[in-house]
A protein has these predicted regions:
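C-terminal module of multi-pass small-molecule transporters
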Residues: 1-107, 123-156
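Alpha-helical oligomerization interfaces
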Residues: 108-112
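Intrinsic disorder in cytosolic terminal tails and internal cytosolic loops
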Residues: 113-122, 150-165
Length: 165
């Protein structure tokens, strides 16, 4: 919170989105031979970027609300976060599934050459993951662009509780 107070939500969010996006892109290029430690480190960096985005954006949004609307703002924020997460997951899984399905070998290959089928199916799955992470990177770039529109606003003055109607 001291960093937030010192430099503001905008700079933290921009930095966090940059880290998140930069750490997402390498996932689009993973191979069967990629070491697990590389994936773990990339994932940890992504999570660090997410933490640098979520806290300042949420705090900035709550600071922009008058005190009597904070509970409603929190509820709306939590609802939008859950809905956006669900939609994002559905989109990425759809991309993964469709690209994988389109790249799968013919099923008769499973009977005639099971090892070849396995290799082609693995490559199709990897291509699905590559496509999904590429789409996630595009979402990250869009999110990064949006963070440039954040600005530091002071909290709104407190209104009477009954004035919300």
């Amino acid at each position: 919170s001291r960093i937030f107070d010192k430099i503001g939500a905008r700079r933290l969010a921009i930095t966090g989105m940059f880290i998140l996006t930069a750490a997402t892109l390498p996932f689009a290029f993973l191979t069967k031979a990629t070491p697990i430690i590389y994936i773990i480190v990339l994932y940890a960096i992504r999570m660090f970027g997410i933490s640098m985005v979520m806290m300042p954006v949420t705090t900035s949004g709550m600071n922009a609300l008058p005190m009597n609307l904070l509970s409603h703002g929190t509820a709306v924020n939590n609802t939008f976060r859950q809905v956006a997460s669900s939609i994002g997951t559905a989109v990425l899984i759809s991309v993964l599934t469709n690209v994988t399905k389109d790249g799968l070998p013919a099923s008769d290959l499973l009977k005639t050459a099971p090892l070849t089928y396995r290799d082609q199916a693995t490559n199709a799955t990897l291509n699905g993951y590559h496509a999904a992470f590429f789409v996630a990177t595009i979402f990250g770039v869009l999110g990064l662009a949006i963070t440039f529109f954040l600005n530091k606003k002071e909290a709104m003055p407190v209104k009477e509780v009954g004035a919300m109607k």
